[in-house]
Regions:
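Phosphate-binding beta-alpha-beta segment of Rossmann-like dinucleotide-binding domains, i.e.
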Residues: 1-35, 47-50, 202
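Short, flexible hinge/linker loops that cap or flank conserved catalytic cores
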Residues: 28-32, 53, 111-112, 160
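Glycine-rich Rossmann-fold phosphate-binding loop(s) that bind the pyrophosphate
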Residues: 41-42
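Residues at the starts of beta-strands that form the adenosine-phosphate
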Residues: 49, 57-58
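Short, structured coil segments at secondary-structure junctions
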Residues: 55, 74, 162-164
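Rossmann-like adenosine-cofactor binding region
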Residues: 65-159
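Rossmann-like dinucleotide-binding domain for NAD(H)/NADP(H)
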Residues: 116, 122-210
Length: 210
């Protein structure tokens, strides 16, 4: 959600002008009324939806196993893949890396997206074709992109680094002091529960898996 708000308000661009002693107020598009398209609606997708709806965004999603109850719970709407790509002002990728999601976002999918839309990849690096995304940014097909994950990490040679409209972060989308503490506690809890023979599904990413 931080990436959505970053692009919606263009704070960085305004900050740079102020540091150059340039006073130039601008009207930015904002988030209200914009369509946030979630590709994948697991735990991360749901958490994003919970934060986007209060900003009065129109949240749509696509996944392999839609659940009508989720639509009521999170205030979102299921659409097919084609509609998701066509209507999203922001497209957030929240899927695991599998054979079917490798280069999920390639030139063909990018061509289907709304011109000027914004791509956000917080899934896994190979889910996007970096070179196709780079071309889409340079041509203006994509308005911007936020990428937190890369095909190989550490990554210091991404072609996206040459695109001023790409915001790149070193796989830190979930890296906060609070999250780190919670993950450490969860790890300790799992070890203690396992030793006591009481390990449950509380911290499982895929419920029911062992």
């Amino acid at each position: 959600m931080a990436y959505v708000l970053y692009f919606a308000r263009r704070i960085d661009a305004q900050n740079k002008l102020m540091h150059k002693h340039v006073w130039k107020p601008t009207l930015e598009p904002g988030a209200k009324g914009k369509t946030l398209a979630l590709y994948g609606f697991g735990g991360i997708g749901k958490e994003i939806a919970k934060r986007a709806v209060p900003f009065k965004m129109n949240v749509i999603y696509y996944c392999r196993h839609p659940n009508l109850e989720d639509e009521k719970t999170y205030g979102v709407k299921y659409v097919d893949e084609e509609t998701l790509l066509r209507e999203g002002d922001f497209l957030s990728l929240n899927v695991p890396l599998t054979d079917s999601t490798f280069h999920l976002i390639d030139k063909n999918k990018l061509d289907q997206m709304k011109t000027g839309s914004i791509l956000i990849n917080i899934a896994r690096g190979p889910v996007i074709d970096e070179f196709a995304v780079t071309d889409a940014l340079k041509s203006g097909k994509l308005g911007a992109a936020a990428v937190d994950v890369f095909p190989s990490e550490p990554c210091t040679d991404s072609p996206l680094a040459d695109c001023p409209t790409a915001v790149l972060t070193p796989h830190t989308a979930s890296s906060t002091v609070e999250n780190s503490a919670e993950m450490n506690i969860a790890a300790v809890d799992n070890v203690l529960n396992y030793l006591q023979g009481t390990l449950d599904d509380k911290y499982l990413v895929i419920k029911g898996a062992r």
